[in-house]
UniProtKB/Swiss-Prot annotation:
Cofactor(s) essential for the protein: [4Fe-4S] cluster
Binding site for [4Fe-4S] cluster: 539, 542, 547
GO biological processes: thiamine biosynthetic process; thiamine diphosphate biosynthetic process
UniProt catalytic activity: 5-amino-1-(5-phospho-beta-D-ribosyl)imidazole + S-adenosyl-L-methionine = 4-amino-2-methyl-5-(phosphooxymethyl)pyrimidine + CO + 5'-deoxyadenosine + formate + L-methionine + 3 H(+)
Key words of the record: 4Fe-4S, Iron, Iron-sulfur, Lyase, Metal-binding, S-adenosyl-L-methionine, Thiamine biosynthesis, Zinc
Name this polypeptide is given: Phosphomethylpyrimidine synthase
GO MF terms, alphabetically ordered: 4 iron, 4 sulfur cluster binding; carbon-carbon lyase activity; zinc ion binding
């Protein structure tokens, strides 16, 4: 599959920046060519090969493994076996081939996690990659004449990245079995990131559709993708997604574990869950949402809620606890889970199984009891040299959002916060990409490191490709707005460049510098089509006599 970059991002091309510590490492960026000028504008690019016109991607073969040699050079892993694909896989058979070997950290040896290396003072290729990726945008901002930066630029160096990872304020999700991924960093001292959820259901299940959603999501800017499949072919869908994804892939393993016991919650066990996370770690999943903070004693606090327990994983574990009258087996066996995670460098995403699912339930006792427990689990994970982030709500009115961030930073020792929205009102089914983007922008400003998108289909059905696009774009806007509020110079540079184009009536540049150029151009051309509309010093809103910018330019002239 090859995304047509000239249609999605006109006047753009892919460039590669060489690293210094690791000269063989090249960082891909997208470059916009400013019309009638030698100027170029650099952008962070999450799309990997999909925005490189010189690379044709065949989804049945997977994308290139850029990290394979980096991992091999560390000499701390060993091959378990060659990968196998189920014989009934549709369109997946060619993926695993003879060349993919499943890796694991050497038995009895040190962890193979980015956190372990960082604590040892080692700057890995992954760390330099993310430093170059983020710092190139800061250098560009500093070099733009006339741009008034809100704060002094703090250079993002490989050493700064290492320090942030070492203290747990940032993570670089990098499973050793996902060498196709381009390193990215999640932490509040870096650009705010976004995640896109995809995956089938028992009602709608199609492998090809889910892979295309992933490609669409990363092309429009998703920094990570979660496969939340609960229907048929879970293993094969995930295989095709991981092998073709240039961004980290996350999952909620309890979904597949439940699928293995035919959907009967009472038949779940730690043994089934353990088998599932090993299977997924061997495939290359970069982070797992694990609902280990849903303790049996907390469940009673949800009984008076308006909407009860709305997390699927949280509801599954709560039901299991009550059926067996036992403590959550994910909590009870957490240290054993850590041993597995550190052998593959799978990052913990500690799930908020008791998050509020309605405005009336926001910031209640159950939510914050679980958050305290997640803070305890953060310390245990770090003691095992596992990378860890913490998930957050949910449905929260605007005036209660900041409290969530303050408590999370306090309870969870500044582990990166990863929130679903939050949705700021319950009254807009069909528009929850908007209700949640409002909350996402605010919580990102307050310090959340990654925002999980919400699509227009939230609460209504399984998102299709257009819903995925709408969700990603809504959240790219929210993340960018948060970065502006935090004073990130890279974000100010893009606003400045677009505003200059707008004031100069450079319509094509204005389209191309936007988050969704095709939509901007389409809306403009509905009333002023053709070449003449691209040179006009007005739009159809004001016309030639009432355009404020045209009048303002006349004053200056």
């Amino acid at each position: 599959m090859h995304m047509n970059i000239s249609e999605i991002y006109p006047s753009s091309n892919k460039i590669y920046i060489n690293c210094t510590l690791y000269p063989d490492v090249k960082v891909g960026m997208r470059q916009i060519n400013i019309r009638n000028s030698s100027q170029r504008f650099l952008l962070y690019d999450t799309a990997g090969p999909y925005t490189d016109c010189d690379i044709k991607v065949n989804l049945t073969e997977g994308i290139s493994s850029i990290r394979r040699d980096w991992i091999a050079r560390r000499n701390d892993t060993y091959p378990i076996r060659k990968a196998k694909t189920n014989s009934d896989a549709r369109g997946v058979k060619a993926l695993s081939g003879d060349d993919r070997v499943i890796l694991k950290g050497i038995a009895g040896g040190a962890p193979v996690t980015q956190l372990f290396y960082a604590k040892k003072g080692i700057i890995t290729p992954e760390m330099e990659y993310v430093a170059v990726r983020e710092n190139a945008l800061l250098e560009q901002a500093e070099a733009i004449p006339g741009l008034l930066l809100p704060t002094k630029t703090r250079k993002i160096t490989p050493e700064f990245v290492r320090e942030e990872v070492a203290c747990g304020r940032a993570v670089i999700p990098s499973n050793i079995n996902h060498p196709e991924s381009e390193p990215m960093i999640i932490g509040r001292n870096f650009l705010v990131k976004i995640n896109a959820n995809i995956g089938n259901s028992a009602v709608l299940s199609n492998i090809e559709d889910e892979v295309k959603k992933m490609v669409l999501a990363v092309t429009y800017g998703a920094d990570t993708v979660m496969d939340l499949s609960t229907g048929h072919d879970i293993h094969n869908i995930r295989e095709l997604i991981v092998r073709n994804s240039p961004v980290p892939i996350g999952t909620v393993p309890i979904y597949q574990a439940l699928n293995k016991v035919n959907g009967i919650v009472g038949d779940l066990s730690f043994e089934v869950f353990k088998e599932t996370i090993i299977e997924q770690a061997e495939q290359g999943v970069d982070y797992f949402t694990i609902h280990a903070g849903v303790l049996k004693s907390y469940i009673e606090h949800t009984r008076s809620r308006t909407t009860g327990i709305v997390s699927r994983g949280g509801a599954i574990m709560a039901q299991w606890c009550l059926l067996h009258n036992k403590e959550n087996f994910l909590y009870e066996n957490f240290e054993e889970i850590c041993e597995i995670m550190r052998s593959y460098d799978v990052t913990f995403s500690l799930g908020d199984g008791l998050r509020p699912g309605s405005i009336n339930d926001a910031n209640d006792v159950a939510q914050f009891l679980e958050l305290r427990t997640l803070g305890e689990l953060v310390k245990i994970a770090r003691a095992h040299d596992c990378q860890v982030i913490v998930e957050g709500p949910g449905h929260v009115p605007m005036h209660l959002i900041e409290e969530n961030v303050k408590k999370q930073l306090d309870f969870c020792d500044e582990a990166p916060f990863y929130t679903l929205g939050p949705l700021t009102t319950d009254i807009a089914p069909g528009y929850d990409h908007i209700t949640s983007a409002i909350g996402a922008a605010m919580i990102g400003w307050y310090g959340t490191a990654m925002l999980c998108y919400v699509t227009p289909k939230e609460h209504l059905g399984l998102p299709n490709a257009e819903d995925v696009k709408a969700g990603v774009i809504s959240y790219k806007i929210a993340a960018h707005a948060a970065d502006l509020a935090k004073g990130n110079p890279a974000s100010f540079a893009r606003d400045y460049a677009l505003s200059q184009a707008r004031y100069d009536f450079r319509w094509e540049d204005q389209f191309n510098l936007s988050i969704d150029p095709a939509t901007a151009k389409k809306l403009h051309d509905e009333s002023l089509p053709g070449k003449g509309g691209k040179t006009a010093h007005f739009c159809s809103m004001c016309g030639p006599k009432f355009c404020s910018m045209k009048l303002s330019k006349a004053l200056n002239d």
